[in-house]
């Protein structure tokens, strides 16, 4: 395949890797199953096994984070008011788009460690960051309405947190997004593509807007 718009090119395997955010072995296995081809996977190298395991663990902890953000939203009247009153979201939209809330106190790290997840995994998923000042760990998302970012197959690859406060004396960034991880690379994922692709294909129209709430 060749895309004359962005100059991307390759074969069927590299196309699936790009389209579905898969590693090479995952793409080969996917195509074999799709085409009913008998496929005997070669033994993965230690590096490939480690990469696959790391990706699966990040997907897993992202799902845990989603459940935490969703439950936190249900417990936060300010977040609900912001989403439904100020932004005008319907409850159906909030559920379909997996919108949540990250509490101001930043308690996700504690929540995750109580469930047995290690700090290194939280760092790998960019759900926790390390302070450049003193090396301490802190939640990446705090006091923000959370938008879930999924890949083309529906896997949760990251999050985008939108500041809710109208006044911003600390000059905090309006958005904080998941940085580069083993499953999420900047520029490779479009928010709401997974939720919109089928409908857009049916009506042959897709509207592109600037911000997640739009």
At which residue positions do the language-model features occur?
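Phosphate-handling DNA/RNA-contact segment within nucleic-acid enzymes
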Residues: 47-65, 105-214
């Amino acid at each position: 395949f060749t895309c004359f718009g962005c100059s991307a090119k390759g074969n069927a395997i590299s196309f699936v890797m790009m389209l579905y955010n898969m590693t090479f072995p995952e793409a080969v296995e996917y195509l074999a199953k799709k085409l009913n081809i008998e496929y005997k996977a070669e033994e993965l190298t230690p590096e490939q096994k480690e990469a696959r395991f790391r990706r699966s663990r990040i997907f897993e902890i992202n799902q845990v984070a989603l459940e935490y953000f969703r439950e936190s939203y249900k417990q936060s009247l300010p977040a609900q008011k912001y989403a439904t009153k100020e932004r005008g979201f319907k409850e159906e939209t909030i559920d379909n788009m997996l919108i949540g809330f990250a509490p101001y106190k930043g308690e996700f790290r504690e929540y995750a460690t109580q469930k047995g997840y290690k700090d290194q995994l939280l760092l790998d998923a960019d759900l926790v960051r390390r302070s450049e000042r003193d090396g301490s760990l802190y939640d990446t998302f705090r006091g923000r309405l959370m938008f879930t970012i999924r890949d083309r197959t529906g896997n949760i690859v990251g999050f985008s947190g939108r500041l809710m406060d109208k006044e911003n004396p600390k000059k905090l960034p309006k958005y904080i997004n998941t940085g580069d991880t083993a499953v999420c690379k900047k520029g490779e994922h479009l928010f709401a593509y997974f939720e919109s692709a089928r409908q857009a294909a049916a009506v042959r129209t897709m509207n592109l807007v600037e911000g997640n709430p739009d």
